[in-house]
Design a protein with these regions (language model features):
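Polyanion-binding interface signature
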Residues: 1-137
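Charge-dense, extended regions
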Residues: 133-169
């Protein structure tokens, strides 16, 4: 979540990373549980096979945010381990602004910010993950995102019943 607060991208550079730059890590266990969720023709456990077959190192789609904005997104990096938007700051700014971080930007390359997202901060908001879904189960190029209540990911991975927010009923 806090890629924007990392060291400069280029060794020796003094340029701070773009404000709000973020990606969400995707645990390998998720792809083991639901390997074909993103697209039934793609096995997300087989990154090397996907790369060899398509010549691509990421899966591209449109990510729909709760505020109605839509950004190009990818599931990328080795073994499909990250969710990113183009620009990377779109995902980050949505997360940070929702959690009360109004200016996710380092002032200097050699001084990290104190205003980062931690598990404690997420817990104060009752969150620890995001939920993704297809509004149309046959449209694999459009995915919706929103925050998930604390514990949702663990319940999902254990096939336990999800707690539904009263506002969603």
């Amino acid at each position: 979540l806090n890629a924007w607060n990392g060291n400069p991208k280029t060794r020796g550079s003094q340029r701070v990373r773009p404000g709000g730059e973020a990606y969400l890590p995707i645990p390998k266990d998720l792809w083991n549980k639901c390997p074909f969720w993103i697209n039934p023709s793609i096995d997300m456990r087989d990154y090397a096979g996907y790369k060899q077959e398509t010549g691509q190192s990421s899966y591209k789609f449109n990510l729909h945010f709760p505020n109605g904005k839509v950004y190009p997104a990818i599931i990328g990096q080795a073994n499909f381990k990250s969710l990113e938007t183009k620009p990377q700051s779109a995902l980050g700014k949505w997360i940070f602004n929702s959690l009360g971080v109004e200016h996710p930007q380092r002032e200097r390359y050699d001084e990290p910010s104190d205003d980062i997202i931690t598990m404690d901060r997420l817990m104060r908001f009752g969150l620890d993950s995001v939920k993704l879904w297809h509004e149309d189960p046959n449209d694999y190029k459009n995915v919706w995102i929103d925050f998930a209540e604390y514990g949702s990911f663990e319940r999902f991975m254990k096939d336990e019943m999800q707690v539904q927010d009263e506002s969603e009923e």
